[in-house]
Amino acid sequence: GYEEREVAETVRELDAA
């Protein structure tokens, strides 16, 4: 769903930080 996609994107950004 939309939330899953947003969460996955946020996790990527946090992991790259």
From Swiss-Prot:
One GO molecular-function entry: toxin activity
Main subcellular localisation: secreted
Record keywords: Gamma-carboxyglutamic acid, Ion channel impairing toxin, Ionotropic glutamate receptor inhibitor, Neurotoxin, Postsynaptic neurotoxin, Secreted, Toxin
Cellular localisation: Secreted
Superkingdom of source: Eukaryota
Tissue-level expression: Expressed by the venom duct.
Keyword ATP-binding found: no
Record-level GO cellular component terms: extracellular region; host cell postsynaptic membrane
Signal peptide extent: none
Additional notes on this entry: The mature peptide does not contain cysteine residue.
Function: Conantokins inhibit N-methyl-D-aspartate (NMDA) receptors.
Protein name: Conantokin-Qu
Organism lineage string: Eukaryota, Metazoa, Spiralia, Lophotrochozoa, Mollusca
